[in-house]
């Protein structure tokens, strides 16, 4: 039989879960494959560098700051200076959409918002209203929320105004604040990371912190190093795993 190496970091623990010490850190570079429609910038066969931290049912939020700190160190070693690691938390987004009574549509909203850099806010609004039957006023609230800008401290301070209205939102805000704090402690300069509420990542399995890295002098390339936390590896294995 012949097989191909699939995209999916969970594959690394499939056959050796009883031999690992957690949290397990893994780094790998190799050719991988995924089944999707080939298009510009999206390939079925490509090389990928993986950075993984896997916990046995629990993983500290501090580890969520460890990943972007590694991204910073790698890019710095490459001699790159003008890059930005954008950071957000899916719990903040899910909590905010719950405040608007849009829990059932949160996945559709996040997949649409995730395209805002490519298609612009006007088209994002049109899709929310026309395709997902979201009221225009609520669509405007969504755009205003994800459009909150400023320094990292200013964005986090703006989010504090929503505290107390949704438990998931509050948890996500606590986590994002902790991640921002530890990024500084891990030596990542303020100019190299940004709290950005437009970052959602299009895949539904992300549950916590999400990241996207862009080269500031080459925005046309798009994201060059992305990922996030997900807690659903129990769907694939008999043991509960938390994964970054």
Per-region residue spans from a language model:
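Single conserved hydrophobic/aromatic residue that forms the stacking wall/gate
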Residues: 2-13, 243
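Short internal beta-strands
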Residues: 85-87
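Short low-complexity, flexible loop/linker segments enriched in glycine and/or proline
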Residues: 99-101, 209
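Positively charged, Gly/Ser-enriched RNA/tRNA-binding surfaces
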Residues: 14-81, 91, 127-244
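Short, conserved beta-strand segments within well-ordered enzyme catalytic domains
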Residues: 1, 5, 25-28
């Amino acid at each position: 039989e012949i097989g191909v190496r699939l995209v999916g970091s969970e594959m690394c623990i499939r056959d050796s879960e009883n031999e690992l010490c957690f949290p397990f850190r893994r780094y790998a570079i190799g050719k991988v494959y995924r089944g999707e429609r080939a298009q510009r910038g999206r390939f079925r066969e490509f090389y990928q560098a993986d950075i993984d931290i896997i916990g046995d049912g629990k993983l500290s939020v501090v580890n969520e700051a460890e990943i972007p700190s590694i991204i910073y160190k790698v890019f710095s070693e490459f001699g790159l200076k003008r890059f930005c690691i954008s950071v957000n938390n899916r719990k903040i987004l899910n909590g905010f959409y719950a405040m608007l009574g849009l829990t059932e549509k949160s996945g559709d909203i996040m997949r649409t918002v995730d395209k805002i850099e490519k298609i612009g806010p006007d088209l994002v609004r049109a899709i929310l209203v026309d395709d997902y039957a979201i009221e225009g006023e609520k669509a405007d609230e969504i755009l205003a929320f994800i459009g909150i800008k400023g320094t990292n401290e200013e964005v986090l301070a703006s989010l504090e105004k929503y505290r107390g209205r949704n438990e998931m939102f509050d948890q996500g805000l606590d986590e994002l604040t902790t991640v921002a704090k530890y990024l500084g402690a891990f030596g990542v300069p303020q100019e190299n990371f940004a709290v950005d509420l437009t970052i959602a990542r299009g895949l539904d399995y992300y549950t916590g912190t999400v990241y996207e890295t862009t080269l500031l002098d080459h925005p046309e390339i798009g994201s060059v190093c992305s990922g996030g936390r997900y807690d659903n590896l129990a769907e694939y294995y008999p043991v509960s795993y938390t994964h970054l």
